[in-house]
């Protein structure tokens, strides 16, 4: 990665399709003259990068990869656990990996071609196998449960310079996100062991799949009209294939077999947008960025259209002070659903349809910034409203659902509101550098089908968020860095009391049975404990003949 930038407000017209933020990641292009590489080994993960020329001064490549090995480090402890009970074999599984690759090729004086690929996977689960044997009988049981999620994206880009003032990029992409869960239980019985006479077997498997696959094409133009106007314009097309969720159930017992799939109908949609924006240098003190983003979605015979104005300005005041302000309207056709009641990631992407309207937002922000020597200070406030947000209805879940409701029946749409302020201080040069950032914010949600229609704190509402980062070079070869983060605890719903209720006669094996029922609080009425973490690092550099070594 050569550069990462995040835009949380004041979105230029070239960005669209999301309400919250835009993360722009630029990959290294690879060295066209000589080979370089680096490798890092830490306590829980390793990574490596290599780059160099394919044809000197004409083409280059870059490859990088990383993987955690918590699963490998845990093996000795698991082996010791298994040795305590020879009939039990437990095998936990947790790791993630990702890989990046890029090829850069000069086609001529005015043309370049780029091909890049990324893929990553997180896997979490547990396998357990238990065996019982007494000489004449043998029984085996096994359990396998877990979840995994995978991402991949491939992009091909052609860059062409039409003139000293005009150049373009034509890009073709393919991306995919897949989320799986599994719960498998198997039992084998040999009552006349070692003979297989009378062998019994039973197997249950519950598998859940959700995903999204996109194919897209985009063209962008950058036009330096004159020293005061820099114009960007372009268009994009994306074909979405959504698999909102399919549950596959398998059950085998003796000669009885059941294999059925519930849900899984794909939803196809086409997204088209065009944009134009102008960076206008009005005078030496005032700079403005204005534009329009025109977005369209075609799905299930329905069409949605949105013309989104974007505006931003920066005005230099006396004394090195700068005032900035922005306004942006956004629309999002791809909706992220998160099951708030599960600690592990269960993010599901679902589309806007004829029944599910696209999410929209309006955001305004303003702030002041000042630079004093190596120091930079800023303060900014924002206010944002959101409509047609999506959430699970209370009690609804996509995982292993056996009812006849479609996934659309389990979604509620509502509104949201967020506002707050951010303080930031940074030292960018010198032997010691770093920054301090503090955010004070509020975030609310309101749905007719949730919390009795009353407004409540969003799950990720975080009143206070503080980050302190610093690094210093003691010498040319020894450096120290540290980062401390603090945040208000997550908003959660908890049971306030429990009570017994009677069950109807015939529902239980004895009449008069009772069930214990929890009475939950209002939605997100409680807070988890505040979260804080301190990371420190001490690095030693040793220069070798052909390479540098860090520890």
Residue map of PLM features:
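Surface-exposed extracellular loop regions of Gram-negative outer-membrane beta-barrel proteins
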Residues: 123-125, 130, 134, 178, ...
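Structural signature of Gram-negative outer-membrane beta-barrels, strongest in the C-terminal barrel
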Residues: 212-214, 224-230, 236, 263-386, ...
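Outer membrane beta-barrel strand-and-loop segments of large Gram-negative receptors
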Residues: 214-216, 263-267, 273, 353, ...
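Gram-negative outer-membrane beta-barrel transporters
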Residues: 285, 383-385, 404-494
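Flexible loop and strand-edge segments within Gram-negative outer membrane beta-barrel domains
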Residues: 110-161, 176-211
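Conserved C-terminal beta-signal and adjacent last beta-strands/turns
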Residues: 51, 104-106, 362, 458-551
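Transmembrane beta-barrel wall of Gram-negative outer-membrane proteins
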Residues: 44-67, 86-126, 146-170, 225-226
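N-terminal periplasmic accessory domains that precede
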Residues: 1, 9, 14-37, 48
């Amino acid at each position: 990665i050569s550069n990462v930038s995040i835009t949380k407000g004041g979105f230029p017209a070239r960005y669209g399709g999301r309400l919250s933020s835009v993360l722009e990641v630029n990959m290294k292009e690879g060295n066209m003259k000589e080979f370089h590489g680096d490798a890092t080994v830490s306590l829980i993960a390793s990574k490596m990068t290599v780059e160099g020329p394919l044809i000197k001064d004409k083409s280059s490549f870059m490859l990088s990869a990383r993987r955690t090995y918590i699963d490998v480090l845990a093996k000795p402890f698991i082996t010791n656990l298994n040795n305590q009970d020879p009939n039990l074999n437990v095998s936990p599984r947790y790791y993630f990996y990702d890989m990046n690759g890029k090829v850069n090729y000069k086609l001529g004086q005015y043309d370049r071609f780029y091909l890049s690929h990324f893929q990553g996977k997180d896997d979490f689960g547990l396998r357990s196998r238990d065996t019982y044997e007494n000489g004449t009988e043998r029984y085996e049981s096994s359990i396998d449960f877990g979840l995994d999620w995978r991402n991949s994206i491939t992009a091909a880009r052609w860059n062409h310079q039409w003139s000293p003032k005009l150049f373009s990029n034509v890009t073709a992409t393919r991306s995919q996100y897949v989320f799986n869960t599994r719960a498998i239980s198997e039992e084998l019985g040999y009552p006349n062991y070692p003979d297989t006479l009378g062998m019994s077997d039973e197997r249950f498997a519950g598998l859940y799949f959700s995903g999204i696959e996109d194919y897209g094409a985009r063209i962008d133009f950058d036009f330096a009209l004159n020293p005061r106007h820099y114009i960007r314009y372009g268009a994009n097309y994306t074909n979405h294939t959504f698999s909102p969720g399919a549950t596959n159930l398998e059950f085998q017992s003796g000669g009885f077999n059941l294999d059925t799939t519930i849900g899984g109908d794909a939803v196809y949609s086409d997204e088209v947008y065009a944009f134009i924006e102008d960076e206008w240098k009005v005078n030496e003190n005032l700079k403005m960025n204005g534009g329009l983003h025109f977005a369209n979605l075609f799905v299930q015979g329905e069409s949605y259209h949105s013309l989104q104005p974007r505006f931003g300005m920066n005005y230099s005041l006396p004394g090195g002070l700068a005032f900035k302000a922005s306004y942006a309207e956004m629309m999002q056709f791809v909706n992220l659903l998160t099951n708030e009641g599960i600690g592990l990631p269960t993010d599901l992407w679902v589309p806007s349809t004829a029944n599910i309207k696209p999410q929209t937002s309006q955001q305004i922000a303003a702030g002041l910034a000042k630079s004093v020597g190596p120091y930079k200070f800023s303060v900014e406030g924002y206010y944002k409203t959101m409509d047609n947000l999506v959430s699970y209805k209370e009690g609804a879940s996509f995982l292993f659902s056996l009812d006849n409701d479609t996934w659309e029946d389990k979604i509620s749409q509502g509104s949201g509101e967020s506002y707050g302020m951010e303080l930031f201080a940074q030292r960018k040069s010198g032997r010691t550098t770093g920054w301090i950032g503090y955010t004070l914010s509020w975030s609310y949600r309101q749905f007719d089908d949730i919390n009795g229609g009353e407004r409540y704190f969003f799950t990720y509402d975080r009143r206070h968020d503080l980050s302190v980062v610093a690094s210093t070079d003691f010498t040319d070869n020894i450096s120290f860095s540290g980062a401390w983060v603090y945040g208000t605890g997550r908003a959660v719903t908890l049971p306030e009391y429990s009570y017994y209720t009677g069950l109807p006669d015939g529902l239980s094996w004895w009449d008069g049975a009772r069930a214990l029922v929890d009475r939950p609080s209002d939605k997100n009425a409680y807070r988890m404990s505040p979260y804080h973490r301190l990371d420190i690092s001490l690095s030693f550099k040793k220069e070798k003949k052909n390479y540098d070594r860090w520890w």
